[in-house]
Amino acid sequence: MQGKVALEEHFAIPETLQDSAGFVPGDYWKELQHRLLDIQDTRLKLMDAHGIETMILSLNAPAVQAIPDRRKAIEIARRANDVLAEECAKRPDRFLAFAALPLQDPDAATEELQRCVNDLGFVGALVNGFSQEGDGQTPLYYDLPQYRPFWGEVEKLDVPFYLHPRNPLPQDSRIYDGHPWLLGPTWAFAQETAVHALRLMASGLFDEHPRLNIILGHMGEGLPYMMWRIDHRNAWVKLPPRYPAKRRFMDYFNENFHITTSGNFRTQTLIDAILEIGADRILFSTDWPFENIDHASDWFNATSIAEADRVKIGRTNARRLFKLDGA
């Protein structure tokens, strides 16, 4: 399929590059560094070869979210966004941008999002999970009350917010002790991000801000296949504390969330996602450079779904969500 839009596609700046070192074998690190720092060469050639018209680029993980010093987090976020704006300006026909945000400081994050959207032309934000602040030992999740004004501005700006994974903090990772192969994208990423998303749903955030659009990668971090059970079991909870939100989890998932195919190239999983959340809320992505563009594109081009759904997932859903056709 030609003309695809891909939107979980990462880059790095020198200050954040090392954050990605632990996710690949040592002998692949040199190649990954090249892939993360390159935007205008290898990346574009692969896009051309595999029918990707547009990439929406975002900073690698955890980057800004793992900088406990507020001032430093603000500085790195701003620098990354400025670098990305310069790169996108070289090929505005091919590249768009997600803002990195220093959510250690909700006010600063709000100001940076405003700057990126209003002044730099960014189409949304991608944030790498919870933020660390102060001593770095307490994860800040975005259902907390101090983030409500930030979410109000996201809704006002009418741009999507991509909640990208990161590993849990060491003190919250004891279940993985002795089992490091379960950390990262194998399992811990999905578990951490799914719980964060469920906290957002349960908090009443989407009752207050019903026009928010949240994106989850990796075919929804496992959530599409659990929503019925989550609601079914919560229906049995008759005693307080009940979760604060007014509606079922499934209602928020179906109305406020979108999912991407990033790093999860399995036809059966895609078909199940279509049945659960609908083809209108699924978006093609590759997860470059941690996955290969050819693997993602070759699978998607041939996967056994209706051609109308392929066009939606591969192109038109993203163009509508990000208003790329002036909508």
UniProtKB/Swiss-Prot annotation:
The active site is at residue 287. One of its GO terms (molecular function) is hydrolase activity. GO terms for cellular component: cytosol. Optimum pH is 8.0 for decarboxylation. Optimum pH is 7.0 for carboxylation. The keyword Cell division does not apply. It catalyses: 2,6-dihydroxybenzoate + H(+) = resorcinol + CO2; 2,3-dihydroxybenzoate + H(+) = catechol + CO2. Its EC number is 4.1.1.103. It is an enzyme of class 4 (lyase). It comes from the Bacteria. Binds 1 Zn(2+) ion per subunit. 2,6-dihydroxybenzoate binds at residues 23, 164, 287. Induction: Induced in the presence of gamma-resorcylate. Optimum temperature is 70 degrees Celsius. Keywords: Decarboxylase, Lyase, Metal-binding, Zinc. Zn(2+) binds at residues 8, 10, 164, 287. SUPFAM superfamilies: Metallo-dependent hydrolases (SSF51556). Its cofactor is Zn(2+). Inhibited by CuCl(2), monoiodoacetate and diethylpyrocarbonate. Inhibited by 2,3-dihydroxybenzaldehyde, which is an analog of the substrate 2,3-dihydroxybenzoate. The keyword Ribonucleoprotein does not apply. Pathway: Aromatic compound metabolism. GO terms for biological process: secondary metabolic process. Homotetramer. Dimer of dimers. Involved in the gamma-resorcylate (2,6-dihydroxybenzoate) catabolism. Catalyzes the reversible decarboxylation of gamma-resorcylate to resorcinol. The reaction is reversible, but equilibrium greatly favors the decarboxylation reaction. Also catalyzes the decarboxylation of 2,3-dihydroxybenzoate to catechol, but does not act on 2,4-dihydroxybenzoate, 2,5-dihydroxybenzoate, 3,4-dihydroxybenzoate, 3,5-dihydroxybenzoate, 2-hydroxybenzoate, or 3-hydroxybenzoate. Only resorcinol is carboxylated by the reverse reaction. Belongs to the metallo-dependent hydrolases superfamily. ACMSD family. PANTHER family: 2-AMINO-3-CARBOXYLMUCONATE-6-SEMIALDEHYDE DECARBOXYLASE, AMIDOHYDROLASE FAMILY PROTEIN (AFU_ORTHOLOGUE AFUA_7G05840). This is Gamma-resorcylate decarboxylase. It comes from Rhizobium sp. (strain MTP-10005). The lineage of its organism: Bacteria, Pseudomonadati, Pseudomonadota, Alphaproteobacteria, Hyphomicrobiales.
